[in-house]
């Protein structure tokens, strides 16, 4: 298959994210992103936040938002506590610089003819370093309400149910990687989406882990793409 580079993909797709600051009962604040909406540039509505209420062509679940950030350097994050008093499912979306891993998702979308991809994560915590991220996630497990950094927790069931709806019965793509530290979050995710069709590039490390979509070597990136597309076509 043709390997489209980031410069080409940026012309075809626009990315919008919902960024927020998770406020915990102990006063701690965590920088988060709850969703990334990848949309064909020709189909972006006049009010981008309306995208959050649309059904995408496909949903992808990855590890965490990585280095993704708002393009507007002056953007102020919403403050969230869970459970939320205002249960609106509409999210304030802003133009977003995606993490490099998302370009792999865009390549799959081009191959499949998809125009709207919704990316969720096992955790909303924004951290580009997986070791640091896993340490934070582990620490939050011991904090009252700390587990709500994951959209797959019980308190966010309605938000999750809405977010995984697709316009067609496409499988949910899974690509959060093979770090054993992810197993608790991955198991929670699989319980929450139980019964939904899924596709992944399998890992031999653990049944709930899978190959990372964007390994360092381009040959490995191509291998992941080809395998995922084969799985989706199966």
Regions found by a protein language model. Give the residues of each.
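Glycine/proline-rich loop-helix segments at beta-alpha junctions forming the active-site rim
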Residues: 127-234
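Conserved acidic residues
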Residues: 57, 115, 168-172
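Short connector loops at secondary-structure junctions
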Residues: 114-134
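A short acidic, glycine-rich active-site loop
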Residues: 85-99, 143-155
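Short, well-ordered beta-to-alpha junction loops that form the rim of enzyme active sites
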Residues: 62-63, 122, 175-179
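Histidine-anchored nucleotide/phosphate-binding helix
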Residues: 73, 80, 102-108
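Active-site and ligand/interface coordination hotspots across diverse enzymes
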Residues: 1-91, 233-234
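Acidic, metal/cofactor-coordinating or nucleic-acid-engaging core segments within structured domains
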Residues: 88-100, 106-120
């Amino acid at each position: 298959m043709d390997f489209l580079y980031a410069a080409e993909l940026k012309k075809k797709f626009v990315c919008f994210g919902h960024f927020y600051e998770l406020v915990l009962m102990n006063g701690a604040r965590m920088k988060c992103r709850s969703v990334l909406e990848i949309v064909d540039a020709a189909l972006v509505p006049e009010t981008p936040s309306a995208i959050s209420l649309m059904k995408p062509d496909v949903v992808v679940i990855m590890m965490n938002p990585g280095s993704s950030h708002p393009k507007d350097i002056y953007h102020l994050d919403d403050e969230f506590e869970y459970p939320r008093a205002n249960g609106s499912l509409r999210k304030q979306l802003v133009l977003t610089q995606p993490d490099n891993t998302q370009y792999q998702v865009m390549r799959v979308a081009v191959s499949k003819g998809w125009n709207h991809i919704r990316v969720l994560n096992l955790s909303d915590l924004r951290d580009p370093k997986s070791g640091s991220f896993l340490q934070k996630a582990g620490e939050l497990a011991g904090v009252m309400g700390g587990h709500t950094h994951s959209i797959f927790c019980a308190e966010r069931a309605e938000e999750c149910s809405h977010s995984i709806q697709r316009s067609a019965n496409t499988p949910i793509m899974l690509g959060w990687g093979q770090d054993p530290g992810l197993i608790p979050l991955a198991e929670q995710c699989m319980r929450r989406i139980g019964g939904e069709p899924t596709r992944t590039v399998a890992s031999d490390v653990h049944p709930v882990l899978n190959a990372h979509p964007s390994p360092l070597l381009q040959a490995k990136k191509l291998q992941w793409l080809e395998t995922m597309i084969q799985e989706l076509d199966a």
